[in-house]
Swiss-Prot record:
Belongs to the prefoldin subunit alpha family. GO terms for biological process: protein folding. This is Prefoldin subunit alpha. InterPro entries: PFD_alpha_archaea (IPR011599), Prefoldin (IPR009053), Prefoldin_subunit_alpha (IPR004127). Heterohexamer of two alpha and four beta subunits. It comes from Methanosarcina mazei (strain ATCC BAA-159 / DSM 3647 / Goe1 / Go1 / JCM 11833 / OCM 88) (Methanosarcina frisia). It is found in: Cytoplasm. The keyword Transport does not apply. SUPFAM superfamilies: Prefoldin. The gene is pfdA.
Length: 142
């Protein structure tokens, strides 16, 4: 009986570790999803500003000035965009090149998210296997 109890405790500890891994992975996935949404928003904004300019309308936007405050501003040159390249570096690109850069980054993030989903599935399968094993050890307790 002590063997069974020890084995159940071992399975429970492994299950809890899987749960911790799954939660950490879900949090990371949430950050990646937020980055994908940010790419989508940047692409849409660049395209809208460029379309407004091409149609002869003022390309207006709101610029953050700090502490949740914004000012309205007119974009003088929506054909030029400064894009974050990573590691603290940025570069000025044409609107088209900026959209391409953002689309590439979005594709990379989407692949990462798919890999994370696959990892989460493996963790869930591992948890299920532990639950099945525990049910075999204690059929009346499952």
């Amino acid at each position: 009986m002590a063997e069974v109890s020890e084995e159940i405790r071992n399975l429970a500890a492994r299950h809890q570790e899987f749960q911790r891994q799954a939660e950490a992975l879900r949090q990371e996935m949430s950050m990646v999803q937020a980055s994908i949404a940010s790419c989508d928003q940047a692409i849409a904004t660049i395209n809208e500003l460029k379309a407004a300019s091409e149609a002869g309308r003022a390309a207006e936007t709101m610029v953050p000035v700090g502490f949740g405050s914004y000012v309205y501003a007119e974009v003088k040159n929506p054909d030029k965009v400064v894009v974050n390249l990573g590691a603290g570096f940025s570069a000025e690109e044409t609107a088209e090149a900026a959209v391409e850069t953002l689309n590439r980054r979005k594709e990379q993030l989407t692949k990462i998210l798919e890999q994370m989903n696959a990892s989460l599935t493996k963790i869930a399968q591992g948890m299920q296997a532990l639950e099945t094993e525990a049910a075999k050890i204690q059929p009346g307790q499952a």
